Amino acid sequence: MALLIAWVCVAVSIEKALGGQGDGGDLYSENITRILDKLLDGYDNRLRPGFGGAVTEVKTDIYVTSFGPVSDVEMEYTMDVFFRQTWTDERLKFGGPTEILRLNNLMVSKIWTPDTFFRNGKKSIAHNMTTPNKLFRIMQNGTILYTMRLTINADCPMRLVNFPMDGHACPLKFGSYAYPKSEIIYTWKKGPLHSVEVPQESSSLLQYDLIGQTVSSETIKSNTGEYVIMTVYFHLQRKMGYFMIQIYTPCIMTVILSQVSFWINKESVPARTVFGITTVLTMTTLSISARHSLPKVSYATAMDWFIAVCFAFVFSALIEFAAVNYFTNLQTQRAMRKAARAAALAAALSAATVPAEDEIVSHSDSNCNLKKRVNSVTSQADQSPEASIVSNSASQCQPVSAPPPAPPAPPPVGGTSKIDQYSRILFPVAFAGFNLVYWVVYLSKDTMEFFEPTAMHLRNDHQSN
């Protein structure tokens, strides 16, 4: 019996406890509802906190969930962020069983919020899937935390003088649209070093390295007052790998190929012509393709200078062959004219020696006839040694012929031109020297660009708004 009574008492206690918890939960919800109703009773969301009195301070910080891509052609970048704002509204102080009221986005439209806008933003999107991505909390002392998830497409002015060894500081500027400095000021909630967070996994870019970010604040003046502008600079350094593979290496190889023609025989005109024209066309194609990924700027970039010098080397190699061919033909023509003059002179000399030869032949014939007559007179006499000598002399009398003229010397052919010999040394040395100077200058240079718009630009923007 006693055991039964004990079990009944335990059951009653458990039932009371469960009933008390349910009543307590309902009571808690009712208390929160009363607190919210009391906070909104007489609340005017058209007036900022401290209207007509103290300045409203809005503390901000940014958490970047995704950075990129960066467009060089459009000079803009895109990022996905959690944009947090914190301020104090004395009208929303409360007391009760909880220290923080964690509310959804429906409460946002019922209270005052800062009119923050991004000054250099081209397009900003507030995410609404599956519900508006907004976080709203109210602390007992009236401090409000308001967080939004945004995708921001912002302008990033770039000066591409050092492209592709360039670096850029892409700004993100924001501030109040309508409230001047006398009513709203912005500050960094966690200080200048930790107010903007960019995790390593959020900054994986194809053509850039995000090397860091800095923050600053400034005050600009306009006809409607002074406004506080908060700025975040994202420091981007361009990666060289793509351009080394697609532009620089082909240009260097094309220049080297153009210099191979210096080692080809100067008489091989078709081969050297093909080398020259092919390399010039290749450089033209490379220069056109290099500009496809760039905006149409009016100044020359570092890559433009490199391509221009490579094009000059290739074109100079073609001009060098034209000079070699010209001087070779000129030398050949001179040799042929010299040979022709020598042949004409030899022919003239040959013609001048013909009468003398005829005279010699006639004298020889007369002597021979005289000797024949002498021999015939003495033929009847007794033969003496002297007669036999005269007879032998007569038998040896023959016509004398002049030697033929020497043929003209042929024009010189073959050999290596002195221009080719000098070019084999000067062209490679000059190109190697250019590369040494080019890479030392640009790789050791601080190419990070900063763009600071003037107050006049900001003033005109605000007046247009």
UniProtKB/Swiss-Prot annotation:
SUPFAM superfamilies the record matches: Neurotransmitter-gated ion-channel transmembrane pore, Nicotinic receptor ligand binding domain-like
Tissues expressing this chain: Expressed in brain, in cerebellar granule cells.
One GO BP: inhibitory synapse assembly
Extracellular topology ranges: 20-243, 291-304, 446-465
One Pfam family per UniProt: Neur_chan_LBD
Membrane-side (Cytoplasmic) residue stretches: 265-270, 326-424
Signal sequence region: 1-19
Bilayer-crossing regions: 244-264, 271-290, 305-325, 425-445
Ranges annotated as biased composition (Pro residues): 401-413
Keyword Hydrolase: no
Glycosylation: residue positions: 31, 128, 141
Residues at which 4-aminobutanoate binds: 84, 147
Main subcellular location: membrane
A cellular component term, taken from the record's GO annotations: postsynaptic specialization membrane
Annotated function: Alpha subunit of the heteropentameric ligand-gated chloride channel gated by gamma-aminobutyric acid (GABA), a major inhibitory neurotransmitter in the brain. GABA-gated chloride channels, also named GABA(A) receptors (GABAAR), consist of five subunits arranged around a central pore and contain GABA active binding site(s) located at the alpha and beta subunit interface(s). When activated by GABA, GABAARs selectively allow the flow of chloride anions across the cell membrane down their electrochemical gradient.
Record's comment describing the protein's domains: GABAARs subunits share a common topological structure: a peptide sequence made up of a long extracellular N-terminal, four transmembrane domains, intracellular or cytoplasmic domain located between the third and the fourth transmembrane domains.
Oligomeric form and interacting partners: Heteropentamer, formed by a combination of alpha (GABRA1-6), beta (GABRB1-3), gamma (GABRG1-3), delta (GABRD), epsilon (GABRE), rho (GABRR1-3), pi (GABRP) and theta (GABRQ) chains, each subunit exhibiting distinct physiological and pharmacological properties.
Name of the featured protein: Gamma-aminobutyric acid receptor subunit alpha-6
Organism: Gallus gallus
